[in-house]
Amino acid sequence: MNTQKQEAERMKEIYQSSVKEVLGQMGSREEGLTIKEVEKSREKCGWNELAEGKKKSVLEIFLEQYKDFLVIILIASAIISGILGDAESAAVIVIVITMNAILGTVQTVKAEQSLQSLKKLSGPEAKVLRNGTVTPIPARELVVGDVILLEAGDYVPADGRLIENASLKIDESALTGESLAVEKSLDEIEEEVPLGDRNNMLFSGSFVTYGRGRAVVTSVGMQTEVGKIAGLLKSTSEKQTPLQVNLEEFGKKLSVLILVFCGILFGISVFRGENIGSAFMFAVALAVAAIPEALSSIVTIVLSFGTQKMAKEHAIIRKLQAVEGLGSVSVICSDKTGTLTQNKMTVEDYYIEGRRIRADEIDMADPAQRFLLDCSILCNDSTNENGVEIGDPTETALINLGSRYGVEAAEVRESYPREDEIPFDSDRKMMSTLHRIDGENRMIVKGAVDRLLDLTDQIWTENGIREITKEDKEKIQSQNQEFSMEGLRVLAFTFREIPEEHLLTAEDEDHLVFLGMIAMMDPPREESKAAVEECIKAGIRPVMITGDHKITAAAIAKRIGILKDLSEACEGAEIENMSDEELRGFVPKISVYARVSPEHKIRIVRAWQERGNIVSMTGDGVNDAPALKQADIGVAMGVTGTEVAKDAAAMVLTDDNFATIVKAVENGRNLYRNIKYAIQFLLSGNFGAILAVLYASIAGLPVPFAPVHLLFINLLTDSLPAIALGVEPHTSDVMNEKPRPADESILTKDFLSKIGLEGLVIGVMTMISFLTGYHQDGALLGSTYAFGTLCLARLFHGYNCKSDHPVIFTKRFFNNKWMQGAFALGAILITAVLTIPGLHQVFKVETLNFEQLGTVYLYAFACFPIIQLLKWVRGKLSE
């Protein structure tokens, strides 16, 4: 903590210090370091690279699959089965849990690569001044004190303080979330400001869009801002999804219930005078049979099917459990730039001749409007050739406006070639170019509204050019203020006539004619508003977290429905000194956070989590990565997103569409519901088997099932319908429900009562069938009847578990081809076992004739209408 504090104080001194002072602090000079000084600096500060994180091997990932409590119980069951001589059961259990581990490993084998991706951002090469000579070197060889040279198109290879500036503009959006390129300055900054406002500093991983400059390196490797994010990624642990927590709790509760049942059975057997050893072996065998061995594998398979469905809908799942976790999300914390917005500056409005005109309503036949468009293209250094945009995003937006109206920049520039220019700089806050237009030399001046109004004498109106009045200037200032309050970036355009063969000087930037203003912004994605509305309908709180300015963020948030009132917006500085407890009470009041750092993002996400919420964080920049990892479900943008963000996320959107997240939430809710249906199916069937065995034991009857019967049920008549239930067709009605509580258990009282009631029906019908066969021809026929009835009853029961409501006589009964297939295959197999003479010894059954087979089918089918009737009664009672 002290080291971080010292580092913060040092950075504060750097951006608040003059160029001369910083060079002194870094032990450097304008002509750079000597080789000896480089070696000395490297000994002190190390290489310009990020520390490696320890990667998990495939074997470690594979072994982690065995940490699940239910899997541990199954392993213990396999060992006990082996000791008791039941090799078949032991082998099946081992095969099932091994298959589950392989499936889980295949899905998660892409280990975290965040630090590797961060290393790529450091850039492969840097131009450095050493001994007064410019030398290209690998970026990792840079040291504190090196003087680096930068120009448009370069990535910044390390953090540094600017010492020479020629109109330098840097795109820092990946690091700060700021959508506009930042104009850099040499001036020291007096007050303490956040990262995005340190305009005399350069940061590793950012990109030069315009101009050139020199900087002295102030931090390398893990001490850079990117390095600090790498440190946050290392210290941020992944959270378990609600399903992981639920299944662990479920496994523990289920084990206790089964042990209680088996204990009761053991006590009854001993009380009846049976051998203690035999009674114990039977109780253990029953426990092994009662545990749904296939559950872990079925959940994994269902989630894998879910990932395939979501991939077709533009959402790639990197971490399997995230599929279900999405269904629990109650808060979505979204980055603004590139997530809710298009990450592309776009012209929104014109202001000309005293009127505001929407960008899509410009009249190219109007001389003033066309001249303003031409001026915006001519006084502009950006290009757009064959769809490749080069230059400052603000200037590119002006070129793209022309393209929308069929006005190509190359043609305009060819018609009115540039004869002279005064480049933009942050002191003048303007740029001037000279062109021959309609036989006259015209200087076009583009810049900040306030600055140009001070230099303006005349104004273009619909009645011609006249002297500008105080009222004109007030009206322009008022419109500029209105644009700013809407989060728009505004440029003013002016012009004047220049004498023939005159070279431009700064003195010429006076006595100008005010032409108009062009307002632009990074606009919301078209689908963002509808997606936000869907979130709110589904009980999900959308929150915007961005490094951009508060006014800009609030304007976007208001457009798409996240923000209702400006009081719901705040800046990172406001939460800087809050304790964690204060922040927990503060977050429900705020919908927009602006000018936040990566540390702020993590704290905001954590505060929501500590309030009991499941939080999804979306983003695309390096600055989002730690919060993506802290969130329960991190979501990265696949097209505009950095590799760092993608590697830290649980889900990547291939269409960068915020609406895809809402669809993913719907899929997650449906998958959780389907998994519950599968669990209901497995447990109610197993409970029916336990009740049948328990009744036989109490009544002093022979055991109704042989071990091979239980194996057959577990492998076929359990697994196939359970998987089919897992892929039950999705419905949109789940989005009308509120998110389920994060701590809601799968085994609720209501859920257990359903399992108990349905298991009782299956158990009773199985024992009636057993007694029918037993009284007809003894224990073997009784066992055959019980085995056949239990298998078929569970196949029919698959249809009961398709919904919480009766499905008979509804379209839902036939809407799952996988269920039809599972039922048909299961019925064919059990019919074959019961009727083919050659199989009776293998499966310990008596071969049945068609009349006997019909009896078994009748008892099995009887379970279906009874349970459907019970569902109808429960529904009526709940109303």
Located regions from the model:
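Conserved cytosolic headpiece of P-type ATPases
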Residues: M1-N736, I746-L747, L760, F787, ...
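Alpha-helix capping/termination and helix-coil
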Residues: N380, G612, V665, R669, ...
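Helix-coil boundary and interhelical linker segments in multi-pass alpha-helical membrane proteins
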Residues: S697-A706, F770-G782
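Generic alpha-helical transmembrane segments
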Residues: T717, I762, T784-G798
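Membrane-water interface at loop-to-transmembrane-helix junctions
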Residues: P741-L760, L780-Y785
